[in-house]
Amino acid sequence: LDNEIKNLIIYKKALFNSDLVSENELLKILNPVINSESIWKSHALYLLAEFFYSKEEKQKAKEIFNQILVLPNANSTIKNESQKRLNRDLGE
């Protein structure tokens, strides 16, 4: 399989399991995508940031939303949603 398809499958697995797993499990699933230059990296980071936000871990969420904003190849919709979340809910 093409690398980007593999990364999409990893992202979908994380998305499907995000309500059921711990922080460590989610990180373990997403690490291959987060540590790559994949087009799915911004999506994976956004999922992780929203996971932390839902767990009331606002500082971790804020750090990850900020990482998305400086990614050179971040999806523009993901970037905009990250900026909105920072402005609206995390005081940026």
Please place each PLM-identified region on the residue numbering.
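Soluble extracytoplasmic domains of inner/organellar membrane proteins
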Residues: 1-92
